[in-house]
Amino acid sequence: MGKGLGTVMSFMLKIVVFVSMMVALAAAHERIIFNGIVQDDSFEAHEKLNVEILETGEALQTTVGAPFSVVLPADTLWNICVTNSDTSGAEKEKCYELLYFGNDSTFSKTLGPNEVTVDEPIVPAQVSGNVILSEAQAESKDPVKSSSDSSDVDVEKLLASGGANSKVTELKKVVVQLRRRPKRKPGESVVSAKSIKRMPGLAEADVIKSIQALPGVVASSDFSSKIYVRGGAADQNLFLFDNAVVYSPVHFFGLFSTFLVEGIDDVQFYKSGFPAQYGNRLSSVLKMEGRAGGQDSVEEWFSKSSIKISTFAAQLHTEGHKGPARWVFAGRTTYIGYILDLCNAIGLLDLDLDSEFTDLQGTFMYDFSKDTRLKLSFYIGKDRLEYDPLYMDWGNTAIPLGIYHRINDKWDYNATLAFSEFYQTMKIGDFMSIKMELYSFAGKQWLNYRGIDNHTFTFGYELEYTRERYQEQMATISVADVEKPFHHVAYAQDAWKISPDYLLQYGLRLNYQSAAQHFGVEPRLSLNVNLDETKSLELYGGYYLQYMNSIVYTDQETLNEFYYPVTTTTDGRHIKPASSWLFAAEYSQRDLFEGYDFTAGVYYKTQSNLNTFAVESDSSDDSNSKNMVLADNFGTADGYSMGYELSLRKDKGWWFGGINWSQSISVARVDDGSKPYFPSWHQPYALKLDLGINWKGGEDALWQHKKKGRYFRSSLALKYSSGMPISEYKGYYMAKEIGSQKYSDNIVVVPGSRNAGRQTDYFRIDLKAIDIGREGKWNFSWTIINLTDHDNMFFTFYDTRKTPPKKTSISQFPFLPIMLNYEYYF
């Protein structure tokens, strides 16, 4: 084994060296260095200002008259806003829109009270480039249309008539609309923290609920925030918090986000075609970045804090900024058990259930220089649930330490050391007890290289050590298993901008996992084509491997997964990782109608070597052997999924929202010769609608509010879908058992074909009737859950205490008009 591992590592090293030599041939750089200075009489001399790049979220502190510098990504539109830090609330804000044409450059600008002065960009002699800064209206021979017009600006006329030295008539919010290239990567959806807070119909701002609203993403029940993406299982989604794995980010009741939005920057979500940098999952990647605190304030220990009180939970957050250090910390706890006790006491409920959870989250960032940054984050979450005879507790810990260093204009280096923990206990009386503890230590490092025109290379190496301890006691069967695999990964990828309208991204990911002694290769490929200024087409495909899988005990919905790595059985059989081939395409069109964006996607995905779990009855001593590993009971299943998705959205104006439709089929088959079946998360069709109305507020509201920052909104979210699969039952019989001291009759229910039945269709409307407040100051909202009180099925079983056995269902959320939330910033 040691010789084999050495051979594999030598091969990986040669690959990395080869890629390094290949990309080191470069001579030109791709990023844009943006130098600026604020000279404006409306700001006080030496007043501290906050400069924010809205597209990237990058922010820095400066003062009037002091130069600042920031690195911008190439080939995109930027919005740069400058604000002061007036603690009275009378903030001044001035925003500029920049559009770059040409190749790489460094340019400078001075922001004044009446005009913007721009130096000529430094570009290669054979290439012409222009930088445009514009606000309310640029003075030129041809009029410049504002964003209220239905068509875009004629860029060629604008360049010919003013170019880089256009004069600004008034320094206000940007209203000029210019041509823009898509910034997001192929297969990626980007959701900002601000948009998550504005999501219609949510009782609390929720990262995962915002993802569930996307087409192709299935939420199986009200009681869980688990997601199923394009026919994949819940364990096939990779959750990353600052590059640390979070294994099972769920809270009971499904009303609360695991991650606190106050401490999160933008969320990146890949539901198809994620690049070679990400792996060990088959379906999707949800990447969250911890937010740096103090971006919108002067240097203070407690520059911004908030307290949030809702019907079931309370949350506190604070952030600050001193010198090169910035931080944000947040915590939350629930009192849902006390609320349920109160509801039971006054007769609103008859539910003997106790539940609680706690979350702690934070980020500390330190800038050693403009080129070197250290970032330490943490997330700790703990849950407990008691519902006699069921007892469960589980928790997640993720602690990543990352460093970023910009070596020069061509190279930048990233590294992360991460610790992740997931534990879970489940007991059902004295009949069953399952415990699992999973620890992982990971080291990740990667280099980005931009030294070749129109190429961005990324290559890196990862090493992860996992220790998983599993204990199970079920009737007469006892299993105790400890696994300690190492997982080595080397990858290389390139984003090649073939032309302004073609972006090709390709890569290769190499894996070696020690417990299963498995070497795997994952090729990835995607192509983005801009058909014209508003239309684009994305094509992607690839091969994906998953070395950490969940153990499924039932076909019906469960709250959590029990994770288990691929390994080697006691008889020497190597368990293969789950694998998948994915092929997908997506068409997008901005402004299909005025203000409406349209997307349509299709996909086909195969799945192989999926773990199935079944314990066979065995009266021998071997069934309780301490040498037994859990994988001895594994079988495998194969399957496929295919479908299409349609989406129409409107994000601006006095009303906003969207409608999504998806239709799909997912089929699996176990290798024991049984018939194909629908997996428990199969949802043939789903319709999702969200709608929000700005009744009163800023420029986009139906009525303008006299006081700046005030708003009053309402919103709703509707979902209609097929029910989840269930196994219907054919009948029952009496099993008579004669023991040494007793005689008993046991009713045994005879199941039919696996998942051949289906629950009733799902329908739910959530209404956020009141959403009122002042931006950055306070907010109050009132949400009604399940407005129509539709009875949605959650779990089905047969009560064998009655003859004949009675089919019994547990419902999901009823009509709940009590979701109140108040938030105050100080």
Spans of features found by a protein language model:
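Outer membrane beta-barrel strand-and-loop segments of large Gram-negative receptors
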Residues: 442, 483, 489-491, 576, ...
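Extracytoplasmic beta-strand/coil segments of soluble accessory domains associated
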Residues: 208-245
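Surface-exposed extracellular loop regions of Gram-negative outer-membrane beta-barrel proteins
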Residues: 423, 467-472, 514, 533-582, ...
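Gram-negative outer-membrane beta-barrel transporters
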Residues: 499, 603-606, 628-723, 823
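Short, acidic, small-residue-rich periplasmic hinge/interaction motif at the N-terminus
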Residues: 110-138, 142-200, 234, 271, ...
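Short acidic/polar hinge/loop motifs at secondary-structure boundaries
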Residues: 198, 244-271
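C-terminal beta-signal and adjacent terminal beta-strands/loops
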Residues: 707-712, 719-743, 764, 770-826
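A beta-strand signature from Gram-negative outer-membrane beta-barrel systems
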Residues: 214, 258-300, 304
